[in-house]
């Protein structure tokens, strides 16, 4: 039987109400506390959302009613792990709408 030394744990769910969207980038909650192995963005609003890792450049487009999972540690073993750095702040922009936009993050 395999030996498992690590557990995956969630950070606090981050969200922003799409009614507050202005068309400019806004911080999506707080920066990551831990280096993330996987992140899921869920657009539960009725508006398309653009995601940025720096608040300036467009990095991902997440249509209304959809989600996007970024599993940077998938199929990685040993010391060659890839993570999203602790302290990373994500930003979103879109037109004001109804519903919320969420981010779930997971660390080991």
Regions found by a protein language model. Name each.
Residues 29-31, 65-87:
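Beta-sandwich interaction modules
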Residues 44-61, 104:
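Short, surface-exposed beta-strand/strand-loop-strand elements in extracellular ectodomains
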Residues 32-38:
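Extended extracellular/luminal ectodomain segments enriched in beta-structured repeat modules
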Residues 1-25, 29, 93-108:
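C-terminal interaction-tip segments
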Residues 27-31, 58-59:
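Local beta-strand/beta-hairpin segments that build beta-sheet-rich folds
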Residues 37, 47-49, 99-101:
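Short beta-strand/loop motifs in extracellular/secreted proteins, especially
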Residues 39-45, 92-94:
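Asparagine-centered strand-capping/turn motif at beta-strand->loop junctions
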């Amino acid at each position: 039987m395999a030996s498992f030394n690590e557990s995956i744990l969630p950070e606090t769910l981050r969200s922003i109400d799409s009614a507050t969207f202005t068309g400019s980038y806004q911080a999506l909650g707080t920066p990551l506390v831990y280096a993330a192995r996987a992140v899921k963005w869920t657009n539960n609003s009725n508006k398309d959302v653009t995601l940025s890792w720096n608040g300036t450049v467009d990095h991902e487009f997440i249509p209304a009613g959809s989600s996007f999972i970024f599993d940077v540690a998938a199929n990685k073993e040993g010391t060659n792990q890839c993570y999203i750095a602790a302290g990373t702040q994500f930003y979103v922009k879109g037109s004001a709408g109804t519903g919320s936009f969420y981010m779930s993050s997971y660390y080991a």
